[in-house]
Every structure is written in structure tokens, then in C-alpha cells.
């Protein structure tokens, strides 16, 4: 799945790779989480644009967003059928620029965070689906979900699903909703090739959303690992579940 990610490349470099019209300036982010505004690239009137959208898709047909569970991920296998995504896959495909993402590996009753990135350290374009929710008073909210697929043998050791990354050579195809129908782009929604991504274990400081600094992506040191071992060994206390759904939740036929 994908529940946190990183953007550290300079804005000018991202603009060159993703080819959007605007030149926004934004600081590096090392711990982007659901419900936060995230950069999104979409085609409007034949031109790529940079937009900010809330991470957590809210379908247009939702009447009361307070009673709806935000959808941060969308399963590639069911996007053509699920009511929450079937319109977006046809008309509102987008890219989310990133430099890597985090995944927690379950091991011996513990969850150890890892930073995952392209081995060539190039930015990645995460496949996204967007929706604009319009409220009863005409207010608009742009929202987005990240598409996931079954993991390959390599990344599968961390988690059974991975975010879909679109190759730059396929950006036009993925973003071109008018030129390419949904069935045509489904072949793009797969896990990356084995060996394309690398990863390393990091500090559990990443677990706290308020922590957002460059130290988060560094490999965990032996000293940090020794200090964190007692904390990881403790039985986690029950926490109130956030109103956010991933592809691992029992979303039923609605989603």
C-alpha cells in the first residue's frame, strides 16, 4: 500500500520531468501523510498543470464527507468497477510526483519502517485518480487517491501491495484521458520491474507525522536500532482508528 511518501527534488527539476506549465516553489517534504495537500499533475485543455489536492479521495456523489471514509489508495484490479473510482479512471487520471515512499514490514509482532526509492534515485510518478467534490453551498474540494497493485517478489518482502509508478515514457498515455480510454491504460497498472527499487530500514521517528526532516530517510544506525528495540517490544496500546481507508480495508462493493 502507500500511506506516506517523500518529495525532495528541487521544484525546477520536477517541472522538467513532469512537464507542467506552472513553476511552483515548495519546500522538501519527508513525511507526507493522508489528508494533507499534495502536488498533483493533470492535463486540462491539452496542457499539463500542477495542482494541489487533498490526499484521500472523496467521490462526487458523497453527500456528507464527515460520514465518509477517505480513500487514500485504489486497487488497480477493481478501479474499472468500483463506484468510487470508475469515473476517475476514465476522466481524471493524474500523477503524483515523489522521490520515494515508506512501508512498514511486519516481523515478529513488530512493524519496522523502510524507505523505498528508485535505485537510480530519480523521481517517480505515482499513478493517481482525482475527484472534485462539490458541497451544498458550491464549495469545491479536489481530492486524490494513489493506485496500488500486487507487489513483485522483491518488494513483496515488505508488503503485498505497492503504489503504481508510471514510466515517463507513458506519462502522455496515462494523463491523456481523451486520447486513451481506461481499458487502454490498464496495462500500466502493475508493480515496478524487480530490481528497479531499493530500500533500507529507517528510524521509527517516521511514525509520527509531525516529524518531517531529512534524517527520516537515512538508514537506521546500530545505536538507534538498539534504543528502539525495547519500544518495539512493548505491546502497542489500542488507538482510535483514523477515518482513512486503504486497499487492505474491507471496503465492500461500494468502493
Predicted regions and their residues:
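Short linear sequence motif anchored by a di-proline
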Residues: 1-255
Amino acid at each position: 500500500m502507500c500511506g506516506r511518501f517523500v518529495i525532495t527534488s528541487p521544484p525546477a527539476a520536477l517541472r522538467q520531468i513532469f512537464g507542467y506549465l506552472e513553476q511552483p516553489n515548495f519546500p522538501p517534504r519527508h513525511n507526507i501523510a493522508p489528508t494533507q495537500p499534495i502536488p498533483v499533475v493533470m492535463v486540462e485543455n491539452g496542457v499539463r498543470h500542477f495542482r494541489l489536492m487533498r490526499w484521500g479521495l472523496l467521490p462526487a456523489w458523497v453527500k456528507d464527507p464527515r460520514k465518509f471514509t477517505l480513500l487514500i489508495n485504489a486497487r488497480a484490479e477493481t478501479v474499472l468497477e468500483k463506484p468510487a473510482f470508475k469515473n476517475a479512471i476514465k476522466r481524471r487520471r493524474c500523477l503524483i510526483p515523489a522521490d520515494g515512499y515508506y512501508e512498514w514490514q511486519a516481523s515478529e509482532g513488530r512493524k519496522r519502517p523502510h524507505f523505498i526509492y528508485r535505485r537510480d534515485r530519480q523521481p517517480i510518478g505515482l499513478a493517481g485518480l482525482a475527484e472534485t467534490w462539490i458541497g451544498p453551498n458550491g464549495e469545491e474540494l479536489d481530492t486524490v487517491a494513489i493506485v496500488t497493485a500486487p507487489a513483485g517478489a522483491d518488494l513483496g518482502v515488505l508488503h503485498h501491495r505497492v503504489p503504481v509508478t508510471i514510466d515517463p515514457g507513458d506519462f502522455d498515455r496515462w494523463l491523456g484521458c481523451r486520447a486513451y480510454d481506461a481499458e487502454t491504460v490498464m496495462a500500466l497498472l502493475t508493480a515496478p520491474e524487480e530490481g528497479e527499487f531499493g530500500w533500507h530500514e529507517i528510524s521509527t521517528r517516521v511514525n509520527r507525522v509531525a516529524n518531517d526532516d531529512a534524517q527520516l530517510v537515512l538508514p537506521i544506525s546500530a545505536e538507534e536500532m538498539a534504543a528502539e528495540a525495547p519500544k518495539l517490544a512493548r505491546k502497542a496500546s489500542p488507538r482510535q482508528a483514523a477515518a482513512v481507508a486503504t486497499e487492505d480495508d474491507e471496503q465492500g462493493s461500494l468502493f
